[in-house]
Amino acid sequence: FSSSSSSLLWTLLLSAIYFIFGVNEFSPFILNVIFTTAIIFSVYTIFIKYKLPPSYIFVFLLGIIFITPFPALIFIGMEHTLHVLIAILFVYFSAKELSKERPTSLSTNSMPVSLLMLSPLVPLIRYEGLFLILVVCSLFALRKRLQNSFLLGIFAIIPIALYGLTSYLHGWFWLPNSVLLKGHLPDIKSATGVMQLFGYTSYKNLLKSPHIFFLIIAVLILYSYRHNKQKEVWENGQLMIAIFIITTFLHMQFSLFYWFYRYDAYLVALGLFAIAIPLYEYLPSRLQQISINKTILPKYVALLTLSLFLILPIFSRIKWAIIQLPRATTNIYEQQYQMGLFLKQFYHNTPVAVNDIGAINFLADIKCLDLWGLGSMEVARNKRTGEFGRKQIYDLTKTKGIKIALLYESKGWFLGKIPFQWTKAGEWRISNNVVCGKDTVSFYVVDPSEENKLIANLKQFAFQLPNTIKQSGKYYSEITK
């Protein structure tokens, strides 16, 4: 048992598909294409219900596709497209129900079937979904529909609570290691920690994410303008905007906000979706209807200039997503894929320590010690207590009988933490890295009796590596003598 994934639903879905069709590399890609298509169809259907014109729908669908950006998410092959789909549908149905004075005929004082079905999926697809659940439950409570709020929360929490109990009974934490180790939980024992807890972390992360910052500014302006136009708080469009804003601040406060367009993708798509419907009400139906008061022309110019500055980060995201996608696939092939092939060829069923467990464990059948802590409980416990340095790594790898280690010897990873007893056998370095943790992987001898074997294996595998990988170190110097 391993509690390593923050997406329980995606893990279950892939397991079912692999059980039926066998383990393969194509299923994640195909699933992401299917879910992206479902997103486009769902958003299109919702926009049609609001009688938005085809040209307007086309522009926003194009924006959602490339700003989110779906091409990158499809090739990543993880749960993020399904996360976007569930988040959009949940926000749409929640706002629709909250905007009503009374519960629908499908419920006496209970939730509509659509929300009851979606609520457990929201945290199951990613634990960040709990932010959405918290926001919507709070809004139902403010709406004085406490039974609705309670029911929605219970339906959402029961599945992850059952998983948490299962995890605990197996000796792991209640939450997956990935959630605990990657989340932002400030130390409230200090004044700085208290300040971070009350929004400073969110503020800093927003400044580091200009595309999210733009969306927040845009929806705040739209929300304020509509409020001044007598749009009440419980109006459908206002609700979707409010849910997006509060969820974004919670995510930026407590969660990862960037890693190759993954973690913030649902926020970007949700923000664009939340803007689209209420914004249309204030656009002129024809360009001829736009009248410009020449006496305040400088104000128009200033407003246009400000708008361009706000929109630039969005176009920058589109540009870099397109440019970086082929680079990213090359990065994974040159680093993670080659590491997996190397271990598969030479270290079958062998105890190995690594810090990036995904592709390696998919390709090779090894006894893996995850020194980053996602897949190894001993490491996670040490990192949670703040005691994880050279001594702990040396003792743990010795206890586990680890033969070799493949690590990033870089700042933020294992710089200054490599045990002195280990011997570096070599390095692989990729160029133009945009997605891997670091561009250089170091190979270490952990068990001294393995040194000659590791060097021999690296020398043999050196001729199988793509020539774009820069090899160096002890083994490579023997090749080039």
Language model: regions and residue ranges:
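Membrane-proximal envelope and lipid/glycan-remodeling enzymes
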Residues: F1-K481
